[in-house]
Design a protein with these regions (language model features):
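N-terminal secretory signal peptides and thylakoid transit peptides that target proteins
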Residues: 1-16, 22
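Blade-edge motifs of beta-propeller repeat domains
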Residues: 24-74, 113-134, 164-186, 217-271, ...
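Gly/Ser/Thr/Pro-enriched helix-cap/hinge segments flanking short amphipathic alpha-helices
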Residues: 46-47, 65, 373, 408, ...
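Beta-propeller blade termini
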Residues: 77-87, 136-146, 188-198, 202, ...
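Hydrophobic beta-strand segments that make up the repeating blades of beta-propeller
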Residues: 93-97, 151-156, 204-208, 289-292, ...
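Short glycine/acidic-enriched loop and turn motifs that connect beta-strands
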Residues: 99-102, 211-213, 296, 352, ...
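Short, solvent-exposed loop/turn segments at conserved positions within beta-propeller repeat blades
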Residues: 103-108, 157-158, 238-243, 295-296, ...
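Structural signal for beta-propeller blades
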Residues: 110, 160-162, 245, 297-300, ...
Length: 579
């Protein structure tokens, strides 16, 4: 009965979308916020302090001018990553950057900062060979050649770049020799390493946002897609040409082959694709791909186990809002909010709309649980980077997202829509119920025009810190000053038969009476990559039991693991429990 209802709603939504007239360039349902309930009064022990300046992350992310945005490319921004590029056990920081139409200021570049293990970082960008100026978008991290060092793939407007980690602190641009140099100018957006055919080699999925060139783009205010709140603004995405998404198969010899057509990716109706998340949503052991799409239905490519995919988002309930409307999908958080071993989806949207929480039924079908969960109380902001992460180690994953408008021109005429806005936390109360926290430290209440964010433990103290990209400012590094006695466990997985980074590995952690699933993924949030060590808050549980399903199909169980440690788990070289 549920699938029949979904098919009906999918047909209805498609019909409505075809006839719907749009009065602005970006999707927003213009819904009022739900009334706030009485606060729970439960203490929240995580407090976030911005330590960017003392940590040494000093370079701004340049992205268009500060007081106006004439082109959509100046508004979107870019991502960041926590990664351990030198394998010293301490995550380092990568922050992307863009440019300006008038030319980038001196020193503009993507920036790599090495973790000094004392709360500070050293800029090693030039030494690492990563100096690059352009309109960078997204980053994915993974060991595509299985040599033991994580590599980087960065999308941009123009050309994407594959950086091979040389294992000596430097990277080499191997885009051309890897077969990834594009003959066309594309606007590369979300991207993810994913072993879609489970051969032990990481492939690449890339979403392309839209077709764009400066010479043929309308100026602010020239048509209905170039206005917001009756203020002339940059045009799009509506009214601009779609672009197609791409899948590249790893040949196992350092090169890639585009297989978008034969895999069924190129034949899907295009949309304005943004963040890409590769994860196993239907629990069949094969990675699927979800794309948050801006002002068009989001996409879910279900892996058919034969090298092809089927796009099923409408049928599975993960394309539109509950009332069948397109939303401006930006960022995506993936996690098990209900502690039932299934991966749920949290997706951020534009102002005057709710963000959305899709609950997974275990077979890859989703129910919009936004209003029931309490998320409908917040509609003021444009949401971007997001995560389902346990911020207070109580064993219940919380929701975090960053915000920032795209139209700086609007604030002076409509003050209710400022360009710079705060970060937002929804604390998990259990039972898929959340409450917004209005005070979680100065790092949360500070206002910025933020875009990407990444979650990780840069100081290895057992909690989750946050790295945030801010337009035309240095990034924000928010240290989690967590108090209390809640326990935690952090897992670094190393593949042997599977890809070395263990992307796609699923861990189910049982602690006390709770059971939570997480998966190693290579992109989420907004255009960003988290610390790929899986972090479990354990509450008052002093031990945990682990069940690991490696991408190779190997299953591994580890019982009575002591809490409060960072544990490295290597994949058994022989399949322990054949499927």
């Amino acid at each position: 009965m549920m699938i029949s209802r979904r098919k009906f709603l999918a047909f209805l939504a498609t019909s409505l979308a075809a006839s719907r007239s749009h009065g602005q360039g970006v999707a927003s349902r213009n819904v009022p916020a739900q009334p706030r309930g009485k606060p729970s009064g439960i203490p929240f022990l995580a407090r976030f302090t911005d330590i960017t300046r003392t940590a040494g992350l000093r370079y701004p992310t340049i992205y268009g001018p500060t007081d106006h945005k004439d082109y959509i490319i100046e508004t979107v921004g870019c991502g960041c990553a926590f990664l351990d590029y030198d394998n010293d056990g301490w995550v380092d920081v990568l922050v992307l950057s863009g440019s300006r139409v008038s030319g980038a200021p001196q020193g503009t570049s993507n920036r790599l900062y090495k973790n000094n293990r004392d709360g500070t970082f050293t800029d090693v960008t030039e030494r690492a060979g990563l100096l690059r100026t352009g309109w960078a978008s997204a980053v994915t991290v993974g060991d595509y050649n299985n040599d033991g060092f994580d590599d980087l793939f960065i999308t941009s407007y123009g050309q994407n770049t594959l950086y091979r980690n040389n294992g000596d602190g430097t990277f080499s641009d191997v885009t051309k020799q890897a077969g990834l140099l594009d003959s066309q100018v594309r606007w590369g957006a979300g991207c993810s390493f994913v072993d879609y055919n489970l051969d032990g080699h990481l492939d690449l999925f890339v979403s392309n946002y839209l077709e764009f060139d400066f010479a043929h783009t309308r100026k602010p205010g020239e048509d209905s897609n170039c206005q917001w709140k009756s203020v002339p603004v940059n045009c799009g995405p509506r009214g601009l040409p779609f672009s197609r998404h791409s899948l590249y198969r790893n040949n196992g010899d350092g090169t890639f082959t585009e297989v978008s057509e034969q895999a069924g990716i190129a034949r899907v109706a295009p949309g304005y694709g943004m963040t890409v998340v590769a994860a196993d949503f239907d629990n069949d052991g094969w990675p699927d791909v979800y794309i948050a799409c801006d002002s068009t239905p989001s996409l879910l490519f279900r892996n058919k186990h034969d090298g092809t995919f089927e796009e099923v988002a409408l049928l599975c309930g993960a394309a539109l809002s509950q009332d069948g409307m397109e939303q401006a999908g930006m960022g995506v958080g993936i996690g098990d909010v209900t502690l039932n071993g299934r991966l749920d989806i949290f997706k951020t949207h534009f102002a005057d709309d709710t963000n959305i929480l899709y609950l997974n039924d275990g077979q890859g079908n989703f129910e919009d649980h936004t209003i029931q969960s309490g998320l409908g109380v917040e509609t003021r902001f444009v949401g971007w980077g997001a995560g389902i992460v346990d911020l207070d180690n109580d064993g219940n994953p919380d929701l975090f997202f960053v915000t920032g408008n795209v139209y700086p021109e609007v604030e002076s005429k409509v003050p209710a829509y400022p360009f710079k806005t705060p970060r937002v936390i929804f604390r998990n109360l259990g039972g898929a119920k959340f409450e917004e926290l209005l005070d979680a430290g100065p790092g949360i209440s500070e206002v910025h025009a933020s875009r990407g964010c990444a979650f990780g433990d840069f100081d290895n103290d057992g909690d989750v810190d946050v790295l945030i990209v801010n337009l035309n400012e240095p990034p924000s590094l928010l240290r989690n000053d967590l108090k209390g006695n809640n326990h935690w466990l952090k897992l670094k997985l190393v593949g042997s038969r599977s890809n070395r980074t263990a992307i796609g590995a699923r861990v189910t952690c049982s602690y006390g009476k709770k059971r939570q699933a997480q998966e190693v993924i290579a992109q989420s949030s907004f255009y960003s990559c988290n610390d790929q060590r899986l972090h479990f808050g354990l509450g008052n549980a002093a031990t945990a039991n682990l069940d690991i399903r490696w991408p190779s199909g190997t299953k591994q169980s580890i019982a009575n693991v002591k809490a409060d440690q960072i544990l490295t788990v290597r994949e058994p070289t022989a399949r322990s429990k054949p499927e």
